[in-house]
């Protein structure tokens, strides 16, 4: 399973990449806005840090404008994946872009039906939002499992990115069901690294080591 970082913060990306476990980055307009920079500048900066796929989302909401914006985004770096919301115009734009061999990530996916349509339109990736489904009383990981199972059944090449990940348990469940990718904030990555028993084990090893040296 691949791990993407869901952030537009350069320090977070540098920290994640330095661990040697980050395969790509996903951003959205809200994350970029928090950084107070233009999308083009920030994506350029991210591309200098991360060699993997970088999802950058279009702002337009009509097919032709989405396509035009996507074509401009792909000029920034060969690693750009154009992130498109799953709407009727988004599906139409995805079909056009797939025929131009431009990679797309269909985002804001909340049902298996939406995921199927994204794949039919030629999406490279589809991003079901786990946490947001949970927020309305649904089961986000069950949705991911349904998508993964269906895509496997029909040998669909579209990769599934479990998004809106809130805690390490989501990552564990995604791995167990065979999800292709999880995209996570830095806080979740840090929680995946840390474990109290690891810390206690290190303390015990060091304590025994120093005792032995004093003999």
Swiss-Prot record:
Its main location: cytoplasm. It holds the Pfam family TAL_FSA. It catalyses: D-sedoheptulose 7-phosphate + D-glyceraldehyde 3-phosphate = D-erythrose 4-phosphate + beta-D-fructose 6-phosphate. The keyword S-adenosyl-L-methionine does not apply. The keyword Transferase applies. It comes from the Bacteria. It is found in: Cytoplasm. GO terms for molecular function: aldehyde-lyase activity; transaldolase activity. Transmembrane segments: none annotated. One of its GO terms (biological process) is carbohydrate metabolic process. Keywords: Cytoplasm, Pentose shunt, Schiff base, Transferase. InterPro entries: Aldolase_TIM, TAL/FSA, Transaldolase_3B, Transaldolase_3B/F6P_aldolase, Transaldolase_AS, TSA/FSA_arc/bac. It is an enzyme of class 2 (transferase). Its EC number is 2.2.1.2. GO terms for cellular component: cytoplasm. The active site is at 83 (schiff-base intermediate with substrate). Pathway: Carbohydrate degradation; pentose phosphate pathway; D-glyceraldehyde 3-phosphate and beta-D-fructose 6-phosphate from D-ribose 5-phosphate and D-xylulose 5-phosphate (non-oxidative stage): step 2/3. Belongs to the transaldolase family. Type 3B subfamily. Transaldolase is important for the balance of metabolites in the pentose-phosphate pathway. This is Probable transaldolase.
